[in-house]
A protein has these predicted regions:
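Structural transition elements
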Residues: 5, 39-76, 93-98
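Extracytoplasmic/peripheral linker and loop segments enriched in polar/acidic and small residues
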Residues: 14-18, 22, 30-31, 114-125, ...
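Ligand/substrate-recognition segments at binding pockets and active sites
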Residues: 74-145, 170
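Short, solvent-exposed loop/turn and secondary-structure capping segments
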Residues: 31-35, 43-44, 99-101, 150-153
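Sec/Tat-exported extracytoplasmic proteins
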Residues: 23-28, 33-37, 49, 73-80, ...
Length: 207
């Protein structure tokens, strides 16, 4: 979430999010941890959704590139030196332990920082901290759409109208440019035109 120190909606925060993302070998995690049952993401949507695209501008940040990750992290440090640890919280009564630990190891080894998993005993404890905005670290998240449409992913998870406990935007991400794209998509006269706006919104998220 953007309320964490060093991860605001600014140049430093963008650089650090990109660096962390490019530190993770999603392909290996999908193969070794999920035994081939998961697919590395190239989009914020599932493949059957009409707005899904493998060609989004900026989606290179979703690809494993440790040398670029180190470069971006160094640029962020030039703005504000990193200190402390990077943690990813998860509920220990679920199935996230192995993949969260794997991701933390990638981040630790690539960026040479203290990165660790943070288990919370139960789903209730975990969700209570997420819903109340009390998380003091990054945390695992998941989403199952109610219906197969881009808005049920993007509006629910990233639009300002779904922040502050009003929807699935638990990280309280707020970006007027993104919101404007969602408004245009929702009022578009055709699916094809709506999908173009959804994709432009996703490209904002990838920045």
């Amino acid at each position: 979430p953007e309320w964490l120190e060093h991860f605001g909606q600014n140049e430093e925060g963008n650089l650090r999010r990109q660096a962390i993302s490019m530190s993770i070998d999603r392909k290996t995690v999908a193969e070794k941890i999920f035994h081939g049952t998961a697919t590395p993401a190239v989009d914020f949507l599932a493949a059957p959704i009409s707005a899904y695209s493998k060609e989004l501008k900026g989606n290179e940040v979703l690809k494993y590139n440790p040398s670029k990750a180190k470069e971006l992290w160094a640029k962020a440090n030039a703005i504000s030196p990193w200190s402390g640890e990077f943690g990813i919280a998860y509920n220990a009564d679920g199935t996230a332990k192995n993949w969260v630990e794997a991701i933390c190891n990638y981040i630790k080894n690539t960026l040479d920082i203290d990165a660790k998993s943070i288990p919370m005993s139960t789903s209730d404890e975990f969700l209570s901290n997420v819903d109340s905005g009390k998380m003091t670290s990054a945390y695992r998240s998941g989403w199952g759409p109610d219906y197969p449409s881009a808005d049920n992913y993007l509006v629910q998870l990233y639009d300002s109208s779904s922040a502050d406990g009003k929807g699935g935007n638990s990280g309280n991400y707020k970006n007027p440019e993104f919101d404007a794209m969602m408004d245009k998509a929702l009022s578009a006269p055709s699916t094809e035109e709506a999908d173009k706006y959804y994709q432009q919104g996703e490209e904002i998220l990838l920045q």
